[in-house]
């Protein structure tokens, strides 16, 4: 009987090599994930403002359409300026009338001021005459008992004293009248200042009737048309600030240890995953609402965890500023993937 030849033992080297390569690949993946965190829980965002008129009125011109791009200084809409133009004309007419009244009153005051100076001199003269008449009467009355003067002399002294007092009172009234005329001009001048303030305010309202874009942006949520009455401080539409786009990426708290402001980032949008955008970390969130109870602080962003039956790391929003965004691709709320490259 012929013996069967023994099979050579199979080498274990290929299997060990595969296991070793798998371990190396696993270590590399773990290192890569730890050193260059990535997340697809991200979305595009930008700053927005509510475009509100600061004056009320009917919209007579609407220069934009919904989702239209605008440049800084472009006309957005115009409110009917006629009521404000009428108020301006009325205030300017009041100012002109006041100026004429002040001019005429000033002429009268100048004349009265000249008379007031004369009246002041007359007051002093009348005061001196009244004092002299009073002194004369005081000296004359005792002499009547001695017989040095007659009763008629005393009567004349009394009459002279009364006449001097009457003259003094008359010139004092004239002086008061002149002073009141001068103060009347001051009141008109104060009234003129109030009218000038009204004119300045009306001009400001007239300027506010024309609303222009404060920055480069895009119009959204436009739901009005020409003829609509716009109320002051009520939004007409929203304007996206397209000068600066950023991505809010929610990273696990275990990924944050090497992330700093200025950390380079790569962004891909779901609308075109083959195109990448460079950016830098602007800031890292310092508070979120916990979804498993505990202290709840109003105003904090809430980031839901992906599974509830396992204790997983919380995620915090990281704000990434995009260097050169594509204005046609970037939209608020668009899904994104963010990759960070900590130094």
UniProtKB/Swiss-Prot annotation:
GO terms for MF: xenobiotic transmembrane transporter activity
Provide the transmembrane region boundaries.
13-33
Q: Name one GO biological process term.
A: response to antibiotic
Its chief place of residence is membrane
Question: Which ranges of this chain reside in the Cytoplasmic compartment per its record?
Answer: 1-12
On assembly, the entry states: Could be part of a tripartite efflux system composed of MdtN, MdtO and MdtP.
Q: What is this protein called?
A: Multidrug resistance protein MdtN
């Amino acid at each position: 009987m012929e013996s069967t030849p023994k099979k050579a033992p199979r080498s274990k080297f290929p299997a060990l090599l595969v296991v070793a390569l798998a371990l190396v690949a696993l270590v590399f993946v773990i290192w890569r994930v730890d050193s260059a965190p990535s997340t697809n829980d991200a979305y595009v965002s930008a700053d927005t403002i509510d475009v509100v008129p600061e004056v009320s009125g009917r919209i007579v011109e609407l220069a934009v359409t919904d989702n239209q791009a605008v440049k800084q200084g472009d006309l957005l809409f115009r409110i009917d300026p006629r009521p404000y133009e009428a108020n301006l004309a009325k205030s300017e007419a009041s100012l002109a009338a006041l100026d004429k009244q002040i001019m005429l009153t000033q002429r009268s005051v100048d004349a009265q001021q000249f008379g007031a100076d004369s009246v002041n001199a007359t007051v002093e003269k009348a005061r001196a005459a009244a004092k002299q008449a009073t002194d004369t009467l005081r000296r004359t009355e005792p002499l009547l008992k001695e017989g040095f003067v007659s009763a008629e002399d005393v009567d004349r002294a009394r009459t002279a004293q009364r006449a001097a007092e009457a003259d003094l009172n008359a010139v004092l009234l004239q002086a008061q009248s002149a002073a009141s005329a001068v103060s009347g001009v001051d009141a008109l001048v104060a009234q003129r200042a109030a009218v000038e303030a009204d004119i300045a305010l009306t001009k400001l309202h007239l300027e506010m009737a024309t609303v222009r874009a404060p920055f480069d942006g895009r119009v959204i949520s436009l739901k009005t048309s020409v003829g609509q009455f716009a109320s002051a401080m009520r939004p007409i539409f929203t304007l996206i600030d397209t000068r600066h786009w950023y991505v809010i990426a929610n990273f696990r708290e275990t990924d944050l240890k090497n992330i700093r402001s200025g950390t380079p980032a790569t962004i891909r949008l779901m609308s075109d995953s083959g195109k990448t955008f460079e950016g830098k970390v602007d800031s890292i969130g310092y508070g979120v609402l916990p979804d498993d109870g505990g202290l709840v602080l109003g105003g904090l962003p809430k980031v839901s965890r992906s599974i509830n039956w396992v204790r997983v790391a919380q995620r915090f929003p990281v704000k990434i500023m995009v260097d050169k965004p594509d204005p046609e691709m970037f939209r608020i709320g668009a899904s994104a993937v963010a990759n960070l490259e900590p130094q």
